[in-house]
Structures are given as C-alpha cells and as structure tokens.
Design a protein with these regions (language model features):
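Metal-dependent nuclease catalytic cores that hydrolyze phosphodiester bonds in DNA/RNA
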Residues: 1-134, 176-178, 189-192, 279
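Glycine- and charge-rich intrinsically disordered segments
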Residues: 1-10, 241, 246-247, 254, ...
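Short amphipathic alpha-helical segments and their helix-coil junctions
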Residues: 5-10, 25-38, 136, 144, ...
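Short, polar/flexible loop-turn hinges at active-site or ligand-entry regions and domain interfaces
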Residues: 35-43, 62, 143-147, 166-170, ...
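Charged, terminal alpha-helix-loop-beta segments
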Residues: 100, 188, 192-197, 237-239, ...
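Contiguous, amphipathic alpha-helical segments that mediate oligomerization or scaffolding
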Residues: 253-284
Length: 284
C-alpha cells in the first residue's frame, strides 16, 4: 500500500471538493455548520471501504475478487462489492494502458492563494504524453443518486488540483483535461462510465477564478444562505433559517396563515427532504 493514511482517516478541507456544490451555491452554509459533528452514515462508510478496496486492487495489481471475505473499514468484501469495484478498476486500467497512472494523487490549491487551506485526493490521475491530456477518474459507489460529470464542481475541483500537482511536482503541463465518473451501482442511461473533457485553460483560469470567488464568499460575515438540492447533505440543515423560511412558506401555502411553523431544530431529515422536494429543488 501507499504511505497515505487510510481513506477514513484522511483530513478533509473545510472547503473541500466533495462539498463544493454546496458551498459554491450556499456560501453561508460553511459558517452555519462550523463546529457541528460530521457523523458518517453506513452508506458513506461502505463507500470508503469500496475506495480502499479499489486502491488495493490497483496498487497490488489484483482482481477485486482476490479480497473476497476480507474486512475493510468494518465492511466485508462481498461479491457485489467486488463486482462494482472491478468496474472502476477495469476502467482505470483501460485508460492507463500505455500512459502514466498516479493512484490517489494528493494535491492542494495553495498556488491559487485561497482564503483557507484547500486540498484533497484524486482517486486516479492518468497522463497521456502523446495527447498532452490529463485524465482524472473518480469512483462513485452510491446507488441512489446519479452523479453528473458535465461541469461538476467536485470533479472540476479534483481535476484542477491534480493539474496543479502535476505542474508543480512532475513538470507536466496538459492542454486537455478529461474528467471521468465511474458509478457502477447506478444504472445510468449513459452507462457506468461517463466522461467530460475540457481544455486546460478553462479549468486553470475560468473554473479556478470562479472557485476562488466562491471560497472568498464563504468567509464573509454576511455570507448568504441559499436553499437548494445541495441542502440534503448539509450538516446545518436542521438549524438553517432560510430552509425554515422555505418550510413556513410552503406550509402556509398548503394550509393557511394561522399555521404555526415548527422550530428548525425539530424538523426531521424526512421532513426536510419533503420540504425540498415540494419546492421542486430535487430535479433530475
């Protein structure tokens, strides 16, 4: 294995890639959720185990089935997990054939002078010297929600970080960047492996500028709150005043002006989900 800590023990940036779609859309959510415990769900822990298995397969050059019955991060490697992870491993190896593969590529965005430390780890990064193309691949183990690849803030964040790391550490300067999502447990009409390609300038300048502007907005004392589909994974959803206002407005529209709204803290996760769904915030 690598000298990286286990996936479950890795540090996470307050303005990280996995939550980028939330804090870009709702800058105030960062300050509102400060100090709140990030309690991992069983689904998230299982996804972490799948990522650990994928890394083991790539580093040891083994099939996922070679680890059947082993326990990783508290989860047994089952045939279903091995089958799903193998889809990702095969996709990475296909893309890496004849090229240079970097597994679990760590990066930071300090070269961009962000307002707070911004860093992360890309699952797999592949350099194609002939085409001057950098490919960043991301395993998504979730089965319930389709993950988009086109203009994804999370994947673009990973790609930007990987590109900066390649420039600084290996003197690699791509002209094109390909971003690939591998989601083997979701039956997407476009398949388990989906990709999106852009020119390096768009990522290095245009996306980077937008990302930094959003990062600076999160540090403002009056950073705005903006409810949306990103609320579903926000730690502060139960105490968010804007989400509460949304609940009150919807309830009064359904009932009458004498409706007594609940306190934000009393809203269950199911109630919050229902509020967002009724507001037509969960599209696609």
């Amino acid at each position: 294995m690598s000298n990286l800590p286990a996936h479950a023990n890795r540090a996470h940036a307050s303005l990280g890639a996995s939550s980028a779609s939330r804090w870009i859309a709702c800058p105030g959510s960062v300050r509102l959720s400060e100090g709140m415990p990030n309690i991992s769900t069983d689904y998230a822990r299982e996804g972490t185990a799948a990522h650990e298995l994928a890394e083991m397969c790539l580093r040891k050059n083994k099939m996922a089935t070679a680890f059947l019955g082993q326990e990783i991060e508290g989860f047994e490697v089952t045939e279903d997990m091995a089958e799903a992870v193998q889809v990702y491993v095969d996709a990475v190896l296909d893309e890496a054939e004849g090229n240079t593969l970097f597994i679990e590529q760590r990066f930071n965005l300090q070269a961009l002078n962000p307002p707070v430390p911004m860093f992360g780890t890309a699952d797999a990064v592949i350099w194609n010297e002939d085409e001057k193309r950098l490919t960043v691949m991301d395993l998504k183990y979730g089965a319930g929600v389709p993950v988009k690849v086109e203009n994804s803030p999370q994947l673009s964040y990973y790609a930007l970080g990987a590109m900066l790391a390649m420039e600084a550490e290996r003197n690699i300067f791509p002209t094109r960047v390909r971003m690939v999502i591998v989601q083997p447990r979701y039956r997407h009409p476009n398949g388990y492996v989906r990709q999106f390609e852009i020119d390096a300038y768009s990522l290095r300048v245009e996306f980077a500028d937008d990302l930094l502007a959003a990062a600076h907005r999160t540090q403002e004392a009056d950073a705005p709150l903006s409810p949306g589909d990103h609320c579903r994974f926000c730690l502060a959803q139960a105490k968010c005043p804007k989400l509460h206002e949304q609940a009150v407005a919807l309830a009064q529209a359904e009932f009458d002006d004498n409706f007594l709204p609940p306190e934000p803290e009393s809203l269950s996760e199911a109630q919050i989900g229902d509020i967002l769904a009724k507001a037509d915030l969960f599209k696609g």
